């Protein structure tokens, strides 16, 4: 955990060099200033694994493909992880500028998940120093091999509730905190706590008009199996028009909140990391204004 906190510190240090002179959060001539909203804290609605403070615009559909290979530390026998992969596909839709819903399916435990994400308020130049969002989700696994007998719907279900508070400090640097509560009706193994609280964080440092460094991390509190550890992901965003391409390294196999919060096994700083990518493509489904 100390090494991860050091990474966040380094991201913050990158911000200090330009924080005093960057004009992005200053009033523009002729603007009201107080009500001017600040946008673009992150390139996508996800930092890497975690929800970000970004929202879909009304009428936009986000088609997402997430791919995570095996551990690089497995070596040449598994072609450094390329022979093993985990996959998630999802569709997110902006009902309004402040309300997004989504559904996805993962190969890890054959899980199906759905979520609702609402923006409570958005950062402005003068009156609101940060954005605040609330996300809640449902996850169900369909892999019956995890139980000695056919489990019921309730036995296969999990839920999460997350608060996301983030700030765009200047045109290059953004950071967020995202505490989350995950409840799994039947955890695996059964000795794990059903309710796990985790404190998460995410950061972005913009390198150029189209590229940025990103990082997200969660520290779970409670009883989990000894082989489970904190999920950490470090990546590079490449934005190209309607696409966002995220290349990253992560120790997490699962790509929904239940999976990566409660069942991450790789120890990142011991070489147990996976290479992966996220692809986001935005489609305009309906007109913003009628």
Where in the sequence are the language-model features?
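C-terminal low-complexity, charged extensions that often adopt amphipathic alpha-helices
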Residues: 153-154
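Transmembrane beta-barrel domains of Gram-negative outer membranes and organellar outer membranes
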Residues: 20-147, 157-161, 166-185, 205, ...
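A mid-sequence, solvent-exposed acidic-amphipathic segment
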Residues: 173-219
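Short hydrophobic "helix-edge" motifs at membrane interfaces and signal-peptide entry regions
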Residues: 4-5, 86, 199
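Bacterial Sec-dependent N-terminal signal peptides
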Residues: 1-23
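Positively charged, low-complexity, intrinsically disordered RNA-binding extensions
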Residues: 227
């Amino acid at each position: 955990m100390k090494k991860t906190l050091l990474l966040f510190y380094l991201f913050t240090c990158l911000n200090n060099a330009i924080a005093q002179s960057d004009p992005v959060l200053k009033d523009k001539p002729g603007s009201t200033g107080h009500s001017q909203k600040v946008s673009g804290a992150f390139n996508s609605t996800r930092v890497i694994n975690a929800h970000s403070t970004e929202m879909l615009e009304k009428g936009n559909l986000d088609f997402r493909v997430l791919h995570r290979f095996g551990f690089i530390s497995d070596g040449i026998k598994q072609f450094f992880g390329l022979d093993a992969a985990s996959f998630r596909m999802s569709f997110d839709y902006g009902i309004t500028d402040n309300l997004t819903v989504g559904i996805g399916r993962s190969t890890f435990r054959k899980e199906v998940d759905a979520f609702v994400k609402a923006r409570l308020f958005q950062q402005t130049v003068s009156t609101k120093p940060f954005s605040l969002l609330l996300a809640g989700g449902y996850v169900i696994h369909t892999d019956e091999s995890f139980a000695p007998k056919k489990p019921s719907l309730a036995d296969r279900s999990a839920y999460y509730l997350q608060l996301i508070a983030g700030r765009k400090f200047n045109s290059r640097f953004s950071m967020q905190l995202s505490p989350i509560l995950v409840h799994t009706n039947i955890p695996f193994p059964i000795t794990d706590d059903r309710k796990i609280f985790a404190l998460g964080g995410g950061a972005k440092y913009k390198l150029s008009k189209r590229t940025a460094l990103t990082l997200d991390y969660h520290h779970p509190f409670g009883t989990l199996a000894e082989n489970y550890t904190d999920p950490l992901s470090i990546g590079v965003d490449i934005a190209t028009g309607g696409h966002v391409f995220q290349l990253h390294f992560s120790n997490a196999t699962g790509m929904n909140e239940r999976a990566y919060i409660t069942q991450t096994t790789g120890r990142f700083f011991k070489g147990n990391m996976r290479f992966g990518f996220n692809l986001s493509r935005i489609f305009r489904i309906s007109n913003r204004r009628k």
